[in-house]
Amino acid sequence: MTERVATTLGLYPLPDWAKDELSDLKGHQKSDLVDGSEGPEVREAYGRVREELIDDQRAAGLDRVVEGQGRWDDWLAHPLAVHDGVETGGIVRYYDNNNFYRDPRVVDDLAVDGGDVAAELDAATGLLEDDEPLQAVLPGPYTLAQLATDEYYGDESEFLAAIAEFLAGEVAAFPEHETLFLLDPSLVTEPPADDANERVSDAVDTVAAATDADVVLQSYWGAHEEKTYAHLMDADVDAFGFDFVAGDRDTHLYNVTEYGTKDAVSLGLVDGQNTAVESPDTVAERIDWVTEQIPSQTFDTVYATPNTELAYLPVSTYREKLAVLGEAVELAAGTEVSA
């Protein structure tokens, strides 16, 4: 019987009260964004944000709980933006939308330097009940390398390997977690060159090997090029995540049919950037439709997720979409998935 899991990619919108309070506490300039050296008042405010974001997931009945990433001012570049070997540069557009992040300029060795993300997850663990499984979230190594500027290593291969080792060190410091989602949208928005595909797969392996949890490599805002997908099949992850909102569904299905997939799958079925709220029935139907298109495999686990981070949405809409996911998985749970 296939397990259906309602979860998200993290990076939630800040509650309205927190936007005002944190703006007053931190300041309004680029230099005031999170860099890992926040004072006690700022940390306490983010602690209340974390508690509220976890309560939102609990109320929605999600099957995995993320920390929420309320501190990630620099989106997926956050783990580098707080690193001692990184200097944050100018503002850069975050993919093809109206959000921005500080360019993380890597100027020194990317040794593990304190486990910023691990500390967030430790705090989240303290808020969970015994039966609430934690889901960790990190940028995938290729995406983090693409978002950064290398001013230290001087070689793309060496830089990607260093990013992967840095992320693996972060993961090794994590508290116990049920799943790890590696968010790697650049795999489809800026696909690796043909001669880099194998290195990218190896980098994913490096990060995945650092945990005993199930690892999901989630891409969005497109579909994988054929060669990229074929090489990623060699990566030792438990599931690939596919964007069935903004990605080309025919390309997804072609890749899976031609090259196979893993024993679990993550389906981005709820629009993380559109305020229109899907119905639970519609999302449940999408779960069944996607899994019915590939009659060669029965998935052990199907993760139902938004297609992107949710920080683009108003708080009220984000909460509605969480509830839709929780209810949709319940509706879809009565039938076995063959795919």
Q: Predicted regions: what is each one?
A:
Residues 1-339:
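Domain-level signal for soluble alpha/beta catalytic cores
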